[in-house]
């Protein structure tokens, strides 16, 4: 089943559930009421669009989308080209520069190249109101992303989950450590990065774990031109 399962199956199943219909109706009603909701409707499910279920190698869990203009586009930690790199991603790049030989910090925060190589960049909550962090928490998204993680946990093997910060680590408690690899560190936010995110070497460790399974490593270098 795992080879043939797709996000269309997983998400299609959830769309039949009352809780998820309510979540989608809530988000749509907020947009209809004139509130600015990020990311745009066309981008909400981009994490699944760019990384098919059977192609996932690595899962990075974020919290909720960036809530400033033109930032969020459906991939956690990533921002659209032309937007200033947010502080957490600055620290991710700082760690990559220490961890991966030859890594050059790009002048942008666009991580689509990671997604296209099998890195699922998944926020726990997939929408947010402009300027209001966590405004769409507890509206059903957490249940949906629990089901997503559960599907990966049950139907895939040897995935590498990068859980940064207590929120992601709590979310990842269900992951079967016998089937998958779980790497944990503090969140890359400026508030906590110096408590152990910087120096965690998760990117080189991820590639070592992939290569040990005979799987191609991730090229963590985003294009220097956005």
Swiss-Prot record:
Coiled-coil ranges per UniProt: none
Record keywords: Cytoplasm, DNA damage, DNA repair, Hydrolase
EC number of the protein: 3.2.2.27
SUPFAM superfamilies in UniProt: Uracil-DNA glycosylase-like
Reaction(s) catalysed by this chain's protein: Hydrolyzes single-stranded DNA or mismatched double-stranded DNA and polynucleotides, releasing free uracil
Pfam families: UDG
GO MF: uracil DNA N-glycosylase activity
UniProt main location, coarse: cytoplasm
Active site per database record: 64 (proton acceptor)
Gene3D superfamilies (UniProt xref): Uracil-DNA glycosylase-like domain
PROSITE patterns hit by this protein: U_DNA_GLYCOSYLASE (PS00130)
GO annotation terms (biological process): base-excision repair, AP site formation via deaminated base removal
Gene Ontology CC terms: cytoplasm
Localization (cell): Cytoplasm
Role, per record: Excises uracil residues from the DNA which can arise as a result of misincorporation of dUMP residues by DNA polymerase or due to deamination of cytosine.
Family label: Belongs to the uracil-DNA glycosylase (UDG) superfamily. UNG family.
Name the record gives this protein: Uracil-DNA glycosylase
Protein source organism: Vibrio cholerae serotype O1 (strain ATCC 39315 / El Tor Inaba N16961)
């Amino acid at each position: 089943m795992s080879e043939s399962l797709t996000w269309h199956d997983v998400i299609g199943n959830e769309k039949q559930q009352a809780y998820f219909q309510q979540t989608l109706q809530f988000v749509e009603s907020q947009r209809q009421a004139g509130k600015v909701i990020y990311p745009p409707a066309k981008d909400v499910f981009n994490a699944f669009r760019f990384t098919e279920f059977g192609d996932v190698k690595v899962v990075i869990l974020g919290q909720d989308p960036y809530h400033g203009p033109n930032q969020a586009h459906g991939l956690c930690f990533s921002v659209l080209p032309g937007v200033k790199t947010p502080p957490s991603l600055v620290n991710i790049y700082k760690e990559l520069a220490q961890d991966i030989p030859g890594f050059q910090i790009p002048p942008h925060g666009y991580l689509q190249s990671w997604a296209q190589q099998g890195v699922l960049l998944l926020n726990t909550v997939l929408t947010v109101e402009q300027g209001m962090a966590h405004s769409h928490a507890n509206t059903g998204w957490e249940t949906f992303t629990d089901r997503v993680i559960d599907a990966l946990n049950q139907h895939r093997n040897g995935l590498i989950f990068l859980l940064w910060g207590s929120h992601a680590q709590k979310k990842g408690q269900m992951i079967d450590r016998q089937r998958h690899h779980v790497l944990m560190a503090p969140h890359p936010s400026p508030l906590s990065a110096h408590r152990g995110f910087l120096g965690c070497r998760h990117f080189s460790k991820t590639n070592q774990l992939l290569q040990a399974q005979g799987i191609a490593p991730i090229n963590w270098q985003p294009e220097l031109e956005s």
